[in-house]
Curated annotation (Swiss-Prot):
This is Cytochrome c biogenesis ATP-binding export protein CcmA. The complex is composed of two ATP-binding proteins (CcmA) and two transmembrane proteins (CcmB). The gene is ccmA. It is an enzyme of class 7 (translocase). Pfam families: ABC_tran. GO terms for molecular function: ABC-type heme transporter activity; ATP binding; ATP hydrolysis activity. It comes from Shewanella frigidimarina (strain NCIMB 400). GO terms for cellular component: plasma membrane. GO terms for biological process: cytochrome complex assembly.
């Protein structure tokens, strides 16, 4: 399975094979992800979508093959790659004992940012008035928006997002889609999984990688 384009290549997957619990989830998977791409990883449950995202992000190792960033194996340019990577997993990664503002402040500071307005950023994800609320007291949608708020203040080229629309209402999904488009138009890329339909990002704007697992 190969997906390619002639734009500036940010990421390359070369002959990736992933095996989990004696199942081949994908084998010999190769593709390029370019500046300006919005890429959806799709497939049935258990096909390896999250596994592929984690391999691309360098959080898991493939059984075979490699991922390159700007032509170099990500394990040999780890600092540069991590500097340009924003990864949000299926779990929100929000600490329930911290407020929404404290969570955002923590996540941005460990990402190397020191000049930002948390109140303004949280307002962009409709959390005005909830800045001081403990994350553990927020609704599922507010909890997810707290995690996604860091997208509003990110210089990372590569966004890898596992089910970013979970617990987000229709208006929130549309706002995220617009943000993804802006990021792609500025020269970044977005790689995501989702079970929800997108209404702003058209099929013509979206590239897809389809996975289908098989047993060894």
């Amino acid at each position: 399975m190969t997906i390619s384009n002639q734009s500036q290549v940010l990421l390359s997957a070369n002959e990736l094979t992933c095996i989990r619990e004696e199942r081949i989830l994908f084998d010999g998977l190769s593709f390029n992800i370019n500046a300006g791409d919005i890429v959806q990883i799709e497939g049935p449950n258990g096909a390896g979508k999250t596994s592929l995202l984690r391999i691309i992000a360098g959080l898991s190792r493939p059984y075979a093959g490699e991922v390159e960033y700007s032509g170099e194996n990500i394990n040999r340019c780890r600092d540069e790659f991590n500097h340009d990577l924003l990864y949000l997993g299926h779990l929100a990664g929000v600490k329930s004992e911290l407020t929404a503002e404290e969570n955002l402040n923590f996540n941005l500071r460990i990402s190397g940012y020191d000049d930002f307005d948390t109140t303004a950023i949280l307002a962009k994800v409709n959390l005005t008035g909830f800045e001081e609320a403990l994350a553990g007291h927020l609704s599922a949608g507010q909890h997810r928006r707290t995690a996604l708020a860091r997208l509003q203040h990110s210089n990372c080229k590569i966004w890898i997002l596992d089910e970013p629309f979970t617990a987000i209402d229709k208006k929130g999904v549309e706002e995220l889609e617009q943000l993804f488009i802006q990021h792609a138009e500025s020269g970044g890329c977005v790689i995501l999984t989702t079970h929800q339909d997108m209404s702003i990002i058209s099929d013509a704007m979206l590239r897809k990688i389809t996975l289908d697992y098989r047993f060894v």
